[in-house]
Amino acid sequence: MSFQCGIVGLPNVGKSTLFNALTESGIPAENYPFCTIEPHIGIVELPDVRLKDLARIYSPEKVTPATVEFIDIAGLVKGASKGEGLGNQFLGQIRQTSAILHVVRCFDDKNITHVDGSIDPVRDVETIETELLLADIMTLEKRKQKVEKLARSGDKEAKDSLYILDLLLEHCSDGKAARLLTIDEDYNEFKRSLHLLTEKPVLYIANTSEAETMEDDTGEHVRSLEEYALKENNIVISLCSSIEQEIALLKEEEKPIFLQEYGLSEPGLNKVIRTSFELLGLQNFFTCGEKEVKSWTISKGSTAPQAAGNIHSDFERGFIKADTFHYSELIKNGSEKALKELGLIRQEGKDYIVKDGDCIFFKFNV
């Protein structure tokens, strides 16, 4: 399973710098709007100490981490929903993503222009949210026109769809994101099928100054963003994208010293990647052996056969059982042999719900 996180925000807020840090690439990060026209795509490893621990125990020929795909989407501006600043193209790119990382400028720098002339994180967030909402309203109105004809003919499914469309239109017209509308479980599949921009989960990235990072002090700009995010139960991660880019370009042995200088326990990007994972309700299980130790990504709540299907469809189709133990038990006891002697390797069936950190050996027959 793979998923994409779209990095969005106004022009000149640090999106491309953040992307460079995430992917350790060197795309332009110039001080003018629309520096990024075509979206830049990067695949990033999920930071996971468990994989290193498993590799130490199994000494495999190959270690394969889980990955996250990030897309650097050009800066949105007011009027994007009407096509301003190549808005239609950029909104279409956001529609293809699984989650949104919204980069918000929370630093003052006279050398870097702001499209609105001043620093106001809440105003900036609302500018983007408004454009996404307007685009969603247009999507809903177009869909409603198509469904109304069928509903008038007595089609029950169309009537149900029309009911949900009206609920969403009223909700979005009130300036509320589609993800905040709770509806009956029976209608969630239809809601998801609309691919609304404001249905996507959002993580706010407060891009702060180097001074704020060194002082470990939350400034007024970050505090205002946190208060705004709290209203929607959203998360804010504070980091300085320019520092993160410097860290990303260092050799591994140099990173701890640099982090210590800034009083950081780890790169802020590690938290961004992990939180993006959690935002989408994803988790990992592992397959372990002498040839390969690999991390696999599944949705929380997945059954053992569904997890097996991520490896190969035959594994799901011919699933028999799953020999399972948890990563923590392996670390505690030191070896798979010790787990067997203690009776800690379980045989799970088709109804087993896979837990984050499970190590699984699937048995199947096709």
Q: Where do the model's predicted regions map?
A:
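Conserved G1/Walker A P-loop phosphate-binding module
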Residues: 1-113, 122, 141-142, 147
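C-terminal-of-GTPase-core extension/linker across diverse P-loop GTPases
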Residues: 2-8, 13, 19, 146-353, ...
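Short, intrinsically disordered, mixed-charge
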Residues: 24, 56, 92, 130, ...
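Conserved nucleotide-binding/hydrolysis micro-motifs of P-loop NTPases
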Residues: 24-25, 50-51, 75-77, 105-111, ...
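Alpha-helical initiation/capping and key positions within long helical/coiled-coil segments
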Residues: 36, 89, 132, 139, ...
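Flexible beta-alpha connector loops of hexameric P-loop NTPases
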Residues: 76-82, 117, 123-132, 151-157, ...
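Switch/coupling subdomain of P-loop NTPase systems
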Residues: 95, 99-102, 107-135, 139-142, ...
